[in-house]
């Protein structure tokens, strides 16, 4: 089962993202997630994966690519935060790493967990292979 959060690509007036940076494919400007909402979202990924495991799925893929919420956190272009979730590459990677850590805790070591991650996002000021 694949788990993803659309982030700023959500076509909804209440969409959220790491920062209030509008997507070129949606008419809605996202609301920046609060620190509490970031932690709640991490917990939601882990809970969703645990529910999939309980439902009998063989594995879970957490979508960390294609420009969705996780990629938005890793890219300096879409993550302009100044707290522990933004700024340096290490801080921007905290969100996906915490999702994987918490999800692995919830699933145990023997359940299949995959996580594709974009190394490039092909936008000016975004992810480059160098990071």
Stretches found by the model and what they are:
Residues 2-131:
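Flavin-dependent oxidoreductase catalytic cores
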């Amino acid at each position: 089962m694949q788990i993803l959060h659309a982030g700023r690509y959500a076509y909804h007036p209440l969409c959220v993202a790491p920062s209030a940076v509008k997507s070129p494919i949606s008419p809605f400007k996202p609301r920046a997630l609060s620190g509490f909402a970031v932690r709640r979202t991490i917990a939601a990924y882990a809970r969703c994966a645990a529910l999939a495991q309980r439902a009998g799925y063989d594995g879970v893929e957490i979508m960390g690519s294609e420009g969705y919420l996780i990629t938005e956190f890793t890219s300096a272009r879409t993550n302009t935060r100044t707290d522990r979730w933004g700024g340096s590459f290490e801080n921007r990677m905290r969100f996906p790493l915490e999702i994987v850590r918490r999800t692995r805790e919830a699933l145990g070591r023997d359940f299949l967990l995959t996580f594709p991650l974009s190394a490039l996002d092909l936008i000016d000021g975004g992810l480059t292979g160098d990071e």
